[in-house]
Amino acid sequence: MSQQTEPATPLLSRSMSAVIIAQFFSAFGDNALLFATLALIKQLVYPDWSQPFLQMGFVAAYIVLAPFVGQIADSFAKGRVMMFANTLKLAGALLICVGGNPFLGYTLVGIGAAAYSPAKYGILGEITRGDQLVKANGLMEASTIAAILTGSVAGGVLADWNIYAALSICAVAYGVALGANMLIPHLNAARPGQPWHPVQMASSFFSACRVLWRDGDARLSLIGTSMFWGAGVTLRFLLVLWVPHALGITDNATPTLLNAMVAVGIVLGAGGAARLVTLDNVRRCLPAGFLIGVVVVIFTLQHNLLSAYSLLILLGALGGFFIVPLNALLQERGKASVGAGNAIAVQNLGENGAMLLMLGLYSLVVKLGVSVIAIGIGFGVLFALAIALLWASLILTKRRARSAGAK
């Protein structure tokens, strides 16, 4: 008796296409708005030390809301959660456009982004099947990086022309993302009916943290992704000091273009991971993580712009190959235990905590007068050693499990 198999759903289904379009314009708005708002506060003669507070408010929203946004993503249809989050982003952009406090407006965008993140990743596990999840993550990361590239450039260029035109374009981008969210078919909530008491939600969140930490695969993903994004933000600031020191170039464009090369590489690496890595062999990404640290050391010693561009593309490619499978792994493990939304919320807490920690350490060594070359070498060596230790611990754990099974 022959069995009929259900035809496979294409990767770029209506739902997936809507999610990717919404993600691109939402991330485009986030990045363009940052640079447009920086230009605005300069025009309004805010002190220079106030500029980092834009990003701090944005990141702080992720950390403060981490215990709650995962449950929000799992308690409602994720497409509707994404729509609500983009509405908050649109409100923040409009607040800045009409002359409201830019720090308050961008923090409101951060609140929207914090609510958006668990839903945008969690929905991938609901609209794809099996190994399509890794490919879907590759599309999501590629869309995000493309938005970072185009949004950052657009925000800066448009702000030089007209700041309020730049801010208006950001609001339009959020509006387009909101429209794309409306095209996502209604999906059932993953975990409806959970209690809405802040203390219980916080307790549930930290319980999810413990559950994921005890899961070896989830722990690998949490550590790896937190290290990657913490290092990525630190590298962005490192480049600003490295360019004039190593290349003798003092303009503002060169560090931006070098950062863009990393983003281009991440897109390439994400595509490679989608083709070569599955959930069954996800640890294949670890050598790429180790090589990130090695390439940072080699890059720091360069004095040629062309070699710098080439190495940063390679660095980004290694990063994309490293991060995409780890994201997919956490979604899979989280979906099976605490819910994909809660898993991504825990991941956001780890990543943003790592960003604050690494930037704090970076600021400290700069203040102590350590040279940028020494910082770059030390940064690369420490990152490579950390990944090597993580890799070694996984190998030892696997060997112990085999030994126990043999007995």
From Swiss-Prot:
Where in or outside the cell it occurs: the entry states: Cell inner membrane
- Superkingdom of this protein's organism: Bacteria
For this UniProt record, give its keywords in alphabetical order, as a comma-separated list: Cell inner membrane, Cell membrane, Lipid transport, Membrane, Transmembrane, Transmembrane helix, Transport
- Disulfide links within the chain: none
Q: Which GO terms describe its molecular function?
A: lysophospholipid:sodium symporter activity
Membrane-topology annotation of the record: Multi-pass membrane protein
| Membrane-spanning intervals of the chain | 18-38, 53-73, 91-111, 139-159, 163-183, 223-243, 253-273, 286-306, 310-330, 350-370, 372-392
UniProt GO cellular component terms: plasma membrane
Q: Main location per UniProt?
A: membrane
Entry similarity comment: Belongs to the major facilitator superfamily. LplT (TC 2.A.1.42) family.
Function of the protein:
Catalyzes the facilitated diffusion of 2-acyl-glycero-3-phosphoethanolamine (2-acyl-GPE) into the cell.
* Entry protein name: Lysophospholipid transporter LplT
Tell me the name of the encoding gene: lplT
